[in-house]
Amino acid sequence: MKQYQPGINRRNFLKITSMSPFVFGANSNHGASPQSKLAPIRKITKGSKFHWFGYYDKLQFDPTGRYVLGMQVDFEHRTPTAQDIVKIGIIDLQESDRWTEIGTSNAWGWQQGCMLQWVPKSNSEIIWNDRIDNQFVSHIYNVKTGLTSTLSKAIYTISPNGKWAIGTEFSRIQDLRPGYGYAGIPDPYADEKTPKDIGLYKIDLKTGKSKMLFSIADIAKIPSKGKSVEDQWHWFNHLLVSPDS
């Protein structure tokens, strides 16, 4: 009888590959060890808590390469609830990988964290999303002054010059693409396929002023392959600003 083999997850894959130097196959260099071609790897977080960073398109390192951003929680293997808090920290690679907590967030997920990142073109500002009362917001923390400013909107992606960001409603994402949005605030348009009052907005990171660029209803009016899609469920996800913006 063929024995059932459970699907391999990322953690088990890393365990397996770390135990075997031959997993990644042939090497054309005669006599050279496969591991001699691998980049050096070391763990930079400590303790029993769980650490990670996301998303992969965000700036995790400061411009000097000394300071690394990370998130910390005390659980795994379940979906975050509205009550779960993630801790935000800076790791100093030149001081024995010292962890310094700089804040927390009530708006996060495993896939993309809380959009934690260094603000582009800045060597002192860090931004991440949070939930305060019944609103998703974003914080900008200055590592030199220790001061934090709070913007009235959550951000999704930041312009390359670090002056503005694009965002959308994370309650809508959580409703239609669970895991990529945030728990804690129900989607007020859960019964609408193409709401006209929410969409993509642009927010000035200095003034905090925001404006809607276009609504979900606006986008839904654009035909797909010559056919109307206004009867389908719509939301925005995976936003990114062009590098030459």
Residues covered by each model-derived region:
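Blade-terminus and WD-like Trp-Asp/Gly-His loop motifs, strongest in beta-propeller folds
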Residues: L59-Y67, C114-E125, T157-W164, L240-S245
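Surface-exposed loop and turn segments in beta-propeller and other repeat-based domains
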Residues: R42-F50, I102-G109, K211-E230
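Blade-loop segments of beta-propeller domains
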Residues: Y55, Q83-I126, R131
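Beta-strand C-termini and the immediately following turn/loop, strongest in propeller blades
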Residues: L69-E76, Q117-D133, I166-R172, D191, ...
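Short, conserved, GDST-rich strand-edge loop motifs in beta-rich repeat architectures
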Residues: M71-D84, F170-K196
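N-terminal secretory signal peptides and thylakoid transit peptides that target proteins
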Residues: K2-P21
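Beta-strand-rich domains and repeat architectures in extracellular enzymes and scaffolds
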Residues: I44-D84
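Beta-propeller blade signature
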Residues: V86-Q94, I140-V143, D197-L205
